[in-house]
């Protein structure tokens, strides 16, 4: 059976914890924010304090990033533009041992649409 990108996202969402914008906002004081969008998307606007590691490089860069080294139990809120890439990224992070990683449903778009602060 051949899967589509949407199938992969749906499967990932069944295996991860997904939180809404309000819950993500409540975690800001204690969680790391991980933006898995491309650098140009990040430069155009991102959540304050977010760390940018694009989805395509995540598996290769996460363990060497100073904010994540030796911190597999840290709370991580992962987001992308609308929630698909962040679901896939969160699934991978969980598989890599980052068990407290969660995906923000709706992504950057939902955050901005809620009128919340962006850099």
Would you name each region that the model predicts?
Residues 1-32, 39-77, 84-119:
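Rhodanese-like catalytic fold shared by cysteine-dependent sulfurtransferases
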């Amino acid at each position: 059976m051949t899967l589509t990108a949407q199938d992969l996202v749906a499967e990932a969402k069944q295996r991860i914890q997904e939180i809404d914008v309000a819950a993500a906002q409540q975690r800001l004081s204690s969680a790391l924010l991980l933006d898995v969008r491309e650098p140009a998307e990040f430069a155009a606007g991102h959540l304050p304090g977010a760390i940018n590691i694009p989805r395509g490089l995540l598996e290769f860069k996460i363990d060497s990033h100073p904010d994540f080294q030796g911190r597999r139990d840290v709370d991580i809120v992962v987001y992308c533009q609308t929630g698909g890439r962040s679901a896939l990224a969160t699934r991978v992070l969980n598989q890599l041992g980052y068990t407290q990683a969660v995906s923000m449903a709706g992504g950057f778009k939902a955050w901005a649409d809620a009128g919340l602060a962006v850099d």
